[in-house]
Amino acid sequence: MKRSSYILGLLAGFAALAVSCDLTENVQVKADKSMIFGSKSGLELYSNSFYKALPTLKNGFMQDKMCDVGAVSNTDTFIKQGAYNTETATSWSWGALKNINYFIDGCNDPKYCTVDAETRDNYLGIARWFRAWFYYDKLTTYGEVPWFPNNIQSYQNDVMYKDRDSRDVIIRNLIADLDFAYEHIQATSSTGSSTLTRWAAAAFKSRVCLFEAAYRR
């Protein structure tokens, strides 16, 4: 009898435990602004998300396959007449820019960004380098595109659907971003060549200027 009572007590305890545990509870994975912009580690972790925009080693080489660096067996779709139109083109995406501009706006907000100016500007430089990378791709693909210096909210339809800006506006802002990156990115070398240095800003600026000069010639 005592044993039966003991077993029943255990079962009742397990039942109560099962009722009190919410096995479907969602894990909170969203960090607030103070967690991101209030420390160097937060800035570093967020800025790591920008690097996925860079091409892989293979893609970096194959981007030049339309020139004489290697032999290919087919013509790239990019240069085929009529291959792209507004319905089939896949590069008119702005998600990466929203991610970057959110970070830039946060770094410039003293309410949340409480790190020292040198640390802040270092990560601002990294973000602005990637914004330049984003816009260089858009410029070489479409020419004139709208320039968005800040993060846009979903209700700002008048800003979201504004007209395209001129090449002069895009190039001026693009070079300003790269100049800022060169002046403020602290690293001059990278272990494993896996993160940006100030020399990446200088090298990328030379490519941007060469492309635009050749276009305007």
Segments from the language model and where they lie:
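Conserved, well-structured interaction surfaces
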Residues: 35-45, 73-142, 157-172, 176-193
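Short, solvent-exposed turn/loop segments enriched in Gly/Ser/Thr/Pro and often Arg
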Residues: 60-73, 146, 195-197
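Bacterial Sec-dependent N-terminal signal peptides
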Residues: 1-28
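TPR/Sel1-like alpha-solenoid repeat signature
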Residues: 128, 202-208
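Membrane-proximal, proline-rich intrinsically disordered regions
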Residues: 21-62
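Aromatic-lined, polymer-binding surfaces characteristic
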Residues: 148, 192-203
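Short coil/turn linking the two alpha-helices of tandem helical-hairpin repeats
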Residues: 139-140, 146, 189, 211-216
